[in-house]
């Protein structure tokens, strides 16, 4: 087995043969230790407080936020056999594949046929989020917006993979003259944000971030900082991904990162279970409308929840393997709480990264325990157990699940909890939803390359 593939599965492999630098004593980052001189203080300036006023998504459970969360609460699985292409020759033949997606009313037919699904999911989700924020196209509130202070920041881990794959195939089979003129524009990662901004006329900050499976949280963090610095009033932020195609599936198969439970795909994604054997691919988009409290109040916007803070950092350890000591993740959580003005004792819900991989699941749990000393008070669950791992879109969909847990008072189950690892002594909301009043919730997302990200949400209190 290739070393990187083995690391992706959490297996022990001999150290690489190339020379390493002489090890230096590691200094624990200051961020890894909570300040004890004073109690944390939340932001009070309405210009710097960031609230969530809209949500939109494309998912295996459809494109309606309430339906999406209702099906999560019911413990449904969206995982099943892949039928988008012939996957019979692959060792993994199932995924959280979106079926029956329709962008009618949101993307005109001519463009819809050309666009990569990654961009289609982005545009639909962004426009639905704006509608839920009272900023639908042509609305009075939309017309009155200062578009120079309205931005779009929707990232993707892999970009327009279908368009890229088709372009390469045309080049090989037919020559360069048969490459579509849309090949480059629709393959690059920034085009979803760009086309959404073009459609809605937003002229503020606009770009994409690509940090693998941490992408969405990085976008939320960056968007909030634009608002806090006074550079924008409102930003549509999140992530989108559409990688369930032959080259995407084949790539993750080559990493040996995927579950091969083809005989029972519904139970394949089983975070923290002793019998887990890899993650399940998913797809979709999850987008939030993030807005300064001052701006939201001026336009009498519907305030759903509050973004309290976040943090991003890097393990600086390995391309795919998490740090065994959990330092990167634990320090990221600590920094996010400091940014949010929250003490660890205030957090009582965690939407975990929890992908169902051998190494990743327990590494996250160990890091969480370094920050939260009383795990019995915390509910922790995995959205991926039902919809699969949506890669760059994962954090977006999981942020929506986190916010819905706040607004409904119910946390969705982690399904497929059959034989949990003994280290996992949190309440994982095993197999059945639970009523739970969320005080402060955090959502974790980590990506290949050692990218760590944590965002913090809470009920809005004026």
From Swiss-Prot:
<dbReference type="InterPro" id="IPR014031">
    <property type="entry name" value="Ketoacyl_synth_C"/>
</dbReference>
<feature type="transit peptide" description="Chloroplast">
    <location>
        <begin position="1"/>
        <end position="35"/>
    </location>
</feature>
<keyword id="KW-0444">Lipid biosynthesis</keyword>
<feature type="compositionally biased region" description="Basic residues">
    <location>
        <begin position="19"/>
        <end position="29"/>
    </location>
</feature>
<dbReference type="GO" id="GO:0005739">
    <property type="term" value="C:mitochondrion"/>
</dbReference>
<dbReference type="GO" id="GO:0009507">
    <property type="term" value="C:chloroplast"/>
</dbReference>
<keyword id="KW-0150">Chloroplast</keyword>
<keyword id="KW-0934">Plastid</keyword>
<dbReference type="Pfam" id="PF00109">
    <property type="entry name" value="ketoacyl-synt"/>
</dbReference>
<dbReference type="InterPro" id="IPR000794">
    <property type="entry name" value="Beta-ketoacyl_synthase"/>
</dbReference>
<dbReference type="InterPro" id="IPR016039">
    <property type="entry name" value="Thiolase-like"/>
</dbReference>
<comment type="similarity">
    <text>Belongs to the thiolase-like superfamily. Beta-ketoacyl-ACP synthases family.</text>
</comment>
<protein>
    <recommendedName>
        <fullName>3-oxoacyl-[acyl-carrier-protein] synthase I, chloroplastic</fullName>
        <ecNumber>2.3.1.41</ecNumber>
    </recommendedName>
</protein>
<feature type="domain" description="Ketosynthase family 3 (KS3)">
    <location>
        <begin position="47"/>
        <end position="459"/>
    </location>
</feature>
<keyword id="KW-0275">Fatty acid biosynthesis</keyword>
<keyword id="KW-0808">Transferase</keyword>
<keyword id="KW-0809">Transit peptide</keyword>
<feature type="active site" description="For beta-ketoacyl synthase activity">
    <location>
        <position position="389"/>
    </location>
</feature>
<comment type="function">
    <text>Catalyzes the condensation reaction of fatty acid synthesis by the addition to an acyl acceptor of two carbons from malonyl-ACP.</text>
</comment>
<feature type="active site" description="For beta-ketoacyl synthase activity">
    <location>
        <position position="353"/>
    </location>
</feature>
<dbReference type="GO" id="GO:0004315">
    <property type="term" value="F:3-oxoacyl-[acyl-carrier-protein] synthase activity"/>
</dbReference>
<dbReference type="InterPro" id="IPR014030">
    <property type="entry name" value="Ketoacyl_synth_N"/>
</dbReference>
<feature type="compositionally biased region" description="Low complexity">
    <location>
        <begin position="30"/>
        <end position="39"/>
    </location>
</feature>
<dbReference type="GO" id="GO:0006633">
    <property type="term" value="P:fatty acid biosynthetic process"/>
</dbReference>
<dbReference type="InterPro" id="IPR018201">
    <property type="entry name" value="Ketoacyl_synth_AS"/>
</dbReference>
<comment type="subunit">
    <text>Homodimer.</text>
</comment>
<dbReference type="Pfam" id="PF02801">
    <property type="entry name" value="Ketoacyl-synt_C"/>
</dbReference>
<feature type="active site" description="For beta-ketoacyl synthase activity">
    <location>
        <position position="213"/>
    </location>
</feature>
<feature type="region of interest" description="Disordered">
    <location>
        <begin position="1"/>
        <end position="45"/>
    </location>
</feature>
<dbReference type="InterPro" id="IPR020841">
    <property type="entry name" value="PKS_Beta-ketoAc_synthase_dom"/>
</dbReference>
<dbReference type="InterPro" id="IPR017568">
    <property type="entry name" value="3-oxoacyl-ACP_synth-2"/>
</dbReference>
<keyword id="KW-0012">Acyltransferase</keyword>
<keyword id="KW-0443">Lipid metabolism</keyword>
<keyword id="KW-0276">Fatty acid metabolism</keyword>
């Amino acid at each position: 087995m290739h070393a990187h593939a083995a690391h992706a599965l959490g297996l022990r492999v001999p150290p690489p043969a190339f020379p390493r630098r002489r090890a230096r004593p590691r200094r624990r980052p200051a961020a890894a230790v909570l300040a004890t001189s004073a109690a944390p203080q939340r932001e009070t300036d309405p210009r710097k407080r960031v609230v969530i006023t809209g949500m939109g998504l494309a998912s295996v459970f459809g494109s309606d936020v309430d339906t999406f969360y209702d099906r999560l609460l019911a413990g449904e699985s969206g995982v099943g056999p892949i039928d988008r292409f012939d996957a019979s020759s692959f060792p993994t033949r199932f995924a959280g594949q979106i079926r029956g997606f329709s962008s009618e009313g949101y993307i005109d037919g001519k463009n819809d046929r050309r666009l990569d699904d990654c961009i289609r999911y982005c545009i639909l989700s962004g426009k639905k989020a704006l509608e839920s924020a009272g900023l639908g196209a042509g609305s009075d509130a939309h017309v009155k917006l200062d578009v120079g202070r309205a931005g779009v920041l929707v990232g993707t881990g892999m970009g327009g993979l279908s368009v890229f794959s088709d372009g390469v195939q045309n080049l090989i089979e037919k020559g360069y003259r048969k490459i579509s003129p849309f090949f480059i524009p629709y393959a690059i990662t920034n085009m979803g944000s760009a086309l959404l901004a073009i459609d809605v006329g937003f002229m503020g900050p606009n770009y994409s971030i690509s940090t693998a499976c941490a992408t969405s949280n990085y976008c939320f963090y960056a968007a909030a900082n634009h608002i806090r610095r006074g550079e924008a009033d409102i930003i549509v932020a999140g992530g989108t991904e559409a990688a369930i195609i032959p080259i995407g599936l084949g790539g993750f198969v080559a990493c040996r990162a995927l579950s091969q439970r083809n005989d029972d795909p519904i139970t394949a994604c089983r975070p923290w279970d002793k019998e887990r054997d890899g993650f399940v691919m998913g797809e979709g988009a999850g987008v939030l409308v993030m807005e300064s409290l001052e701006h939201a109040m001026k336009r009498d916007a519907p305030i759903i929840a509050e973004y309290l803070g976040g943090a991003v950092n890097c393990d600086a350890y390995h391309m795919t393997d998490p740090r065994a000591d959990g330092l990167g993740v634990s320090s990221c959580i600590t920094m996010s709480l400091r940014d949010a003005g929250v003490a660890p004792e205030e957090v009582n819900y965690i939407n975990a990264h929890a992908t169902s991989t051998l190494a990743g699941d327990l590494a996250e749990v160990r890091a969480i325990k370094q920050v939260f000393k009383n795990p019995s008070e915390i509910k922790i669950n995995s959205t991926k157990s039902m919809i699969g791992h949506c890669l760059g879109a994962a954090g977006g969909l999981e942020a929506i699940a986190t916010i819905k847990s706040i607004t409904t008072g119910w946390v969705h189950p982690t399904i497929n909890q059959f034989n949990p690892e003994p280290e996992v002594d949190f309440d994982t909301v095993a197999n059945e939803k639970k009523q739970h009043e969320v005080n402060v919730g955090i959502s974790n997302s980590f990506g290949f390359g050692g990218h760590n990200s944590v965002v913090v949400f809470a009920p809005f209190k004026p």
